[in-house]
């Protein structure tokens, strides 16, 4: 079983999306079960665990909520690059940590991840007309902008 005990601590929504997707992708590659912190967890101070606020997260079942025991190893990322060794050789029964900001961790289960990250109806419905009229909008911020 793989877990991400600090989900909600290492960054906000975008980071949590990558961390969740990477956890799911690595677990799927090795046919491992996986867990994420329960929605009502208060064991981690200052956690901003927001994945379930806006997304349906339809593949998450009750059995997917929990923690990896603290006596199990935690694997932190050595850099912000894709960790091919972790992806190909991940041991079972560990806790993942770090940001895991690469789609390579979950590209093979992209459809499942997209389904989980479907907006909840109360968010999507008010935006539906705008989206159909203008299509998908993408906002990017370039820190090296010369303007």
Regions found by a protein language model. Give the residues of each.
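N-terminal regions that are enriched for targeting/export leaders
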Residues: 2-4
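Histidine-anchored nucleotide/phosphate-binding helix
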Residues: 19-27
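N-terminal cationic-hydrophobic initiation segments that often serve targeting/anchoring roles
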Residues: 27-28, 138
């Amino acid at each position: 079983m793989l877990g991400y005990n600090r989900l909600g601590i290492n960054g906000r929504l975008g980071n949590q999306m990558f961390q969740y997707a990477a956890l799911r992708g690595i677990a799927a590659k090795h046919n491992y079960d996986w867990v994420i912190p329960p929605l009502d967890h208060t064991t981690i101070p200052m956690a901003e665990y927001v994945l379930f606020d806006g997304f349906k997260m339809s593949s998450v079942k009750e059995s997917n909520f929990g923690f990896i025991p603290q006596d199990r190893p935690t694997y932190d990322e050595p850099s912000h690059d894709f960790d091919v060794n972790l992806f190909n050789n991940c041991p079972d029964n560990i806790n993942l940590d770090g940001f895991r900001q690469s789609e390579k961790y979950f590209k093979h289960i992209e459809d499942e991840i997209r389904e989980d990250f479907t907006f909840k109806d109360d968010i999507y419905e008010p935006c539906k007309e705008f989206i159909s009229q203008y299509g998908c909008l993408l906002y990017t911020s370039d820190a090296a902008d010369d303007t």
